[in-house]
C-alpha cells in the first residue's frame, strides 16, 4: 500500500518516432478523437474523404506505425481537419497491455485469452516494481478490474562478491562466459540458484561457482562413472529382471526411501518458490547420502567378480537413483544430466516424466509399483520408509562419533579397534556389520550398562571447600582427587559427610564426574525417535595387539597403492606387480599380506623385511612415525 501511494503518473506518451503511435487525432480547436480499431479508423477516414479531405487508402492490413498513420486526416464533429498527435506510447504501457495484446483481444482469440488470463507467474528484476509489474497491474485493473498475474517473483540485483554494484569503472564486472567456458553453464546456474533466496540481492562470488562445480557436479559425475564402469564390466542391463525392493539390502532400501523424501521436498519447495532450499537439499542428498555414504558403503558389493543377488540389487538401485536425480536436476542445470540420462536410458531427460506424477503421486509408489516400472522412465517414486531413514541417521551419527573418538585419542582411522559397544538406543543389529566396517572395529556388541566402561572421579569445589579448609584447602583437594576408592568416599560424603584430613567434606564440596576407564573411549549422541529423543553411546576398545597393528598397516598400504593406481589411471580390472619394503614396521601377518594382494589386484606381491634395500623408484611413506 505504501508503495502504491508513492507512485507517480505513468508516462503514457513520449516524443519519439519508433513505438506504438497514440491513436488520438486533434483539431486546431482542441477537439479529440481516440480510435479503438482498424474498422473505426477506416470509417473515420471514409468520412474525411467524403468531406473533401485527401487520404491514402486504409486497407485491413494497414501499417499502424509511423509514418503511415500520420498520413491520415480525420474529420471533427465540427467539420475541422484532425491530425494525429505526434507522440508514441511509452513502451511500459505497451508491456502492460501484453496479456491481451498478444492475442489481439478483444477482436480475436477470446477463448485463448480467457484461458491464459490472469497468468500464473511472472518474473523480473526488482527494478521492475515500478515498471512492468506496475503497468501490468494498472492496465489490468483499469480495463478488466482484475489482476494481471497470480504470482510475481521479484529477483534481487546481482552484486559483486563484496556486495557492491558491478560497474566497468570499478572493474568488478564478471563475464559469465568466463564461467561457462571454465566451470560450465550447469555449475553457474546451480550456484546462482543455491547462493540465496532469489528475491534477495546476490553477492556473486567466482569462488562459489568453482566450489559448486567441484562439490556438486564432479561428485555427481563420479557417482555416474562408478555405476557406468561397473555396469559395463558386468554387462548390466537395466531392462533385465530387477530385484524387488523388499528383497534388497537395508542400504538399498534406505537410499531409495531418501530419494523419495528428498524428491517430495524438492517438488514442494519448487511449488512454494523456495528454489534455493530445494536445490540445497538435493545437493546434500547427492553429495552426502549418495556419494559419501551409499556409494562408499557399496563399493565392495560391486568388486565381487561373480554375479550375485546383492550386486544386482546395488546396480539397479544406483541406476534408479541416478535416473531420478537427473530428472530433478534438469530444470536448473540441464546439460550434464541430459548426457547422463541418455547414457542410462537412451532418451533425453527433457522428454522424461517428472518423477512425482501418477500413479503414486506425492505419496510415492508401492513396492510392487516401483518394481514394475523402475527400469522405464517412471512417473512414480520408490517406497518410503521413515523408520529406516531415522535408523540409518543414527548409524551415521555413531560412525561420526567414532571418528571423533579417534581424533580425540590420536588414533589413526585405519588402525582397527578390537571391539566397539553400543549402549542404549534402538535395535541396530541389522547394521552391526556395516557399522563395524565403517568404524574399523573387529566386532560390535550391545551393552546396557555404561558404567562398565567408566569410573568415578571426584573434583574439589574450591568455592565451597575453601572457607572450611582455609590454609589446608590444597591438601584436602589433593586428597579428594587421589582417593583410593572414590566411590566409597562419595558414599560417605552423601551419607552425612566424610572426614578428609580433619575437614568435614559434604556433597556441596565436591563435583562428581564419570570418565572412561583406561583403554576405553566413548562419545554420546542424541537422536530423535518416534516421540522422544534417545541418548546412545558408542564405546571403543583402544588397546592395541600385534594383530590389530598388522591389519592397520595393511590398510595404510592398500590406501597408498590405490591412490597410485588412480594416479596411473589404471583400469579397474588391471592387475599389478607389487613390492613392499618394511622398515621398523609392525610384523605383517600372512592373512593381511594376502588381503593386500587381493585388494590391490596384485598378481605378484612381495614383502621385504627390515634391512632390505628398496628399489630406486619406490615411494616411501610413514605411518605413525614409522
Tell me the role of every PLM-derived stretch.
Residues 200-209:
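Short, solvent-exposed helix-loop connector elements
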Residues 1-8:
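Single conserved hydrophobic/aromatic residue that forms the stacking wall/gate
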Residues 9-93, 97, 143-185, 209-626:
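Feature 926 captures the class I aminoacyl-tRNA synthetase adenylation module centered on the KMSKS loop
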Residues 116-127:
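A short glycine/serine-rich beta->alpha loop
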Residues 190-191:
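Non-catalytic, structured segments within soluble enzyme domains
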Residues 194:
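Structured mid-domain segments that build the active-site/substrate or prosthetic-cofactor binding neighborhood
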Residues 106:
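Aromatic-residue-lined binding/catalytic grooves and analogous aromatic/hydrophobic interfacial grooves
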Amino acid at each position: 500500500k505504501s508503495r502504491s501511494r508513492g507512485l507517480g503518473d505513468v508516462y503514457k506518451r513520449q516524443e519519439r518516432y519508433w513505438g506504438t503511435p497514440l491513436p488520438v487525432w486533434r483539431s486546431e480547436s482542441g477537439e479529440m478523437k481516440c480510435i479503438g480499431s482498424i474498422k473505426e479508423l477506416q470509417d473515420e477516414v471514409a468520412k474525411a474523404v467524403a468531406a473533401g479531405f485527401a487520404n491514402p487508402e486504409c486497407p485491413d492490413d494497414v501499417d499502424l506505425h509511423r509514418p503511415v498513420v500520420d498520413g491520415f486526416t480525420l474529420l471533427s464533429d465540427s467539420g475541422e481537419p484532425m491530425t494525429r498527435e505526434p507522440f508514441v506510447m511509452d513502451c511500459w504501457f505497451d508491456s502492460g497491455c501484453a496479456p491481451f495484446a498478444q492475442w489481439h483481444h478483444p477482436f480475436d482469440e477470446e477463448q485463448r485469452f480467457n484461458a491464459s488470463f490472469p497468468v500464473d507467474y511472472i518474473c523480473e528484476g526488482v527494478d521492475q516494481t515500478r515498471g512492468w509489474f506496475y503497468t501490468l497491474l494498472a492496465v489490468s485493473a483499469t480495463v478488466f478490474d482484475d489482476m494481471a498475474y497470480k504470482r510475481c517473483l521479484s529477483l534481487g540485483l546481482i552484486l559483486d562478491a563484496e556486495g557492491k554494484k558491478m560497474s566497468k569503472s570499478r572493474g568488478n564486472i564478471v563475464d559469465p562466459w568466463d564461467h561457462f567456458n571454465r566451470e560450465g553453464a550447469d555449475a553457474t546456474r546451480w550456484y546462482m540458484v543455491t547462493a540465496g533466496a532469489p528475491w534477495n540481492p546476490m553477492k556473486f562470488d567466482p569462488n562459489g561457482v568453482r566450489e559448486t562445480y567441484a562439490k556438486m557436479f564432479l561428485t555427481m559425475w563420479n557417482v555416474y562413472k562408478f555405476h557406468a564402469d561397473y555396469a559395463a564390466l558386468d554387462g548390466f542391463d537395466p531392462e533385465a529382471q530387477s530385484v524387488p525392493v523388499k528383497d534388497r539390502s537395508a542400504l538399498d532400501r534406505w537410499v531409495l526411501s531418501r530419494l523419495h523424501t528428498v524428491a517430495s521436498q524438492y517438488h514442494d519447495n519448487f511449488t512454494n518458490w523456495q528454489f534455493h532450499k530445494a536445490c540445497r537439499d538435493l545437493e546434500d542428498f547427492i553429495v552426502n547420502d549418495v556419494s559419501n555414504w551409499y556409494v562408499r558403503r557399496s563399493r565392495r558389493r560391486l568388486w565381487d567378480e561373480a554375479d550375485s543377488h546383492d550386486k544386482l540389487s546395488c546396480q539397479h538401485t544406483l541406476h534408479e537413483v541416478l535416473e531420478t536425480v537427473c530428472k530433478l536436476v534438469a530444470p536448473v542445470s540441464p546439460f550434464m544430466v541430459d548426457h547422463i540420462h541418455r547414457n542410462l536410458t537412451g532418451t533425453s531427460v527433457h522428454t522424461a516424466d517428472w518423477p512425482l506424477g501418477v500413479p503414486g503421486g506425492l505419496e510415492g509408489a508401492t513396492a510392487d509399483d516401483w518394481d514394475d516400472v523402475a527400469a522405464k522412465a517412471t512417473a512414480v517414486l520408490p517406497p518410503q520408509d521413515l523408520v529406516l531413514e531415522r535408523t540409518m541417521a543414527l548409524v551415521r551419527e555413531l560412525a561420526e562419533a567414532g571418528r571423533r573418538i579417534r581424533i580425540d585419542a590420536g588414533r589413526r582411522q585405519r588402525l582397527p579397534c578390537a571391539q566397539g559397544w553400543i549402549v542404549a538406543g534402538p535395535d541396530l543389529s541389522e547394521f552391526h556389520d556395516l557399522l563395524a566396517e565403517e568404524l574399523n572395529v573387529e566386532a560390535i556388541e550391545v551393552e546396557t550398562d555404561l558404567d562398565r566402561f567408566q569410573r568415578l572421579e571426584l573434583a574439589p569445589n574450591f568455592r565451597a571447600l575453601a572457607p572450611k579448609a582455609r590454609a589446608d584447602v590444597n591438601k584436602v583437594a589433593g586428597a579428594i582427587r587421589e582417593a583410593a576408592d572414590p566411590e566409597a568416599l562419595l558414599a560417605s560424603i552423601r551419607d552425612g559427610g566424610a572426614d578428609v584430613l580433619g575437614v568435614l567434606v559434604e556433597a556441596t564440596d565436591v563435583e562428581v564426574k564419570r570418565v572412561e576407564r583406561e583403554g576405553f573411549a566413548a562419545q554420546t549422541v542424541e537422536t530423535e525417535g518416534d516421540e522422544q529423543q534417545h541418548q546412545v553411546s558408542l564405546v571403543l576398545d583402544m588397546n592395541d595387539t600385534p594383530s590389530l597393528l598388522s591389519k592397520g598397516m595393511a590398510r595404510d598400504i592398500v590406501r597408498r597403492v590405490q591412490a597410485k593406481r588412480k594416479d596411473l589411471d589404471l583400469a579397474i580390472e588391471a592387475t599389478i606387480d607389487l613390492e613392499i619394503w618394511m622398515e621398523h614396521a609392525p610384523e605383517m601377518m600372512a592373512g593381511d599380506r594376502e588381503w593386500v594382494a587381493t585388494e590391490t589386484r596384485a598378481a605378484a606381491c612381495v614383502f621385504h623385511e627390515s634391512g632390505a634395500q628398496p628399489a630406486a623408484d619406490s615411494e616411501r611413506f610413514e605411518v605413525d612415525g614409522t
